[in-house]
Amino acid sequence: MKNIAIIGAGMTGLSLAYNLQEHNITIFDKSWRPGGRVSTRKHDNYLFDHGAHYLSTNHSVNQLNEVISRYNLGQIIEIDFAIDFLKNKKTRKKIIIGQNGMNSIPKSIFDNIKVKSYLNSKIIKISKNSNELFSLFSEKEEFKDFDYILICIPYLQSKELSKELIDFTQIVSEPSYDPIHTVMLSYKDINNINVKAGLNLHKDISFFMNQNIKFNELSHDCWVLNMSSEYTKNNIDIDKPELEKYAQSIFEETFDIKNEISFIKSHRWLYAQTKVSYNSISKKNWINSKDNKIFLSGDWVLGKSLSDAWDAGEKFSHYIKILSI
């Protein structure tokens, strides 16, 4: 049995923890809760899935389906979906959502695997000790005696944390991300919008989704808008009020909304979704140190979806099992 530290409690980190439960696992995350970008925001009586919006029913990661079924984490709903709103292409679409928001999926997995964890703990340094074991350091604490360190955070953050321990000259081409501004907005009265989610609402808004179809307790009309990655990159440091006003104006003009807005807030995801995956440029499923003790993984290995993140962890876990025999 090995002592294994997992840095990052997103879907890849949770997948690793789930698949390596025969070892002594400790999970670290800078956030106060697990899930990473599978995030549900609560503001007063408003609820928004402002990270991952849903899980496709067509994904091919069998173990993730098994976990969702085993712990009763999701439900399938069918909604009116715009395949391309600007071209008026619409369909009925089945999607998987969390039982209580998308974050309830990783949170329930985390609660069920019952591993040792340190949330609200940002790891800022990794060092190798004289006994060939590793220590992790947050700003306040040291965590000792780990056999393996599995880093499951966005690639650039992983690289910065492990640059003294991994030879990154071996990486000829690096994975990349697209940033996305997300806008959450709510109206006191329900708007009569006949499509519940979709793509290409506007040249600057790549995705939109109603939240009332996920949270039955919502009395106000709540929506999440994703600005396009191109718009976000061109306006990466835009003032939030300016961004929110712009997104609101597009949304209201598109759907001829006359109701008064009751809430609006934006969030910038610098590492919103994988643009170029590591596997697509290297044919590899992780990055490792020469001594096979420090590893990097994440959704950026395989793709941009929630299922890609889980799949990256599951694939990687098989190698760790072989190493630790």
Over which residues does each language-model region extend?
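Beta1/beta-strand and adjacent pyrophosphate-binding region of the FAD-binding site
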Residues: 1-12
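N-terminal FAD cofactor-binding segment of flavoenzymes
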Residues: 19, 40-81
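Short beta-strand to alpha-helix junction loop
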Residues: 54-62, 87-110, 237-243
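A conserved short coil-to-beta-strand element within the FAD-binding core of flavoproteins
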Residues: 119-134
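Glycine-rich FAD pyrophosphate-binding loop
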Residues: 7, 19-43
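Flavin (FAD/FMN) cofactor-binding core of flavoprotein oxidoreductases
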Residues: 252-292
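Central helical "cap/lid" subdomain
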Residues: 35-36, 146-196, 257
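Active-site substrate-recognition segment that forms the wall
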Residues: 184-235, 246, 250-255
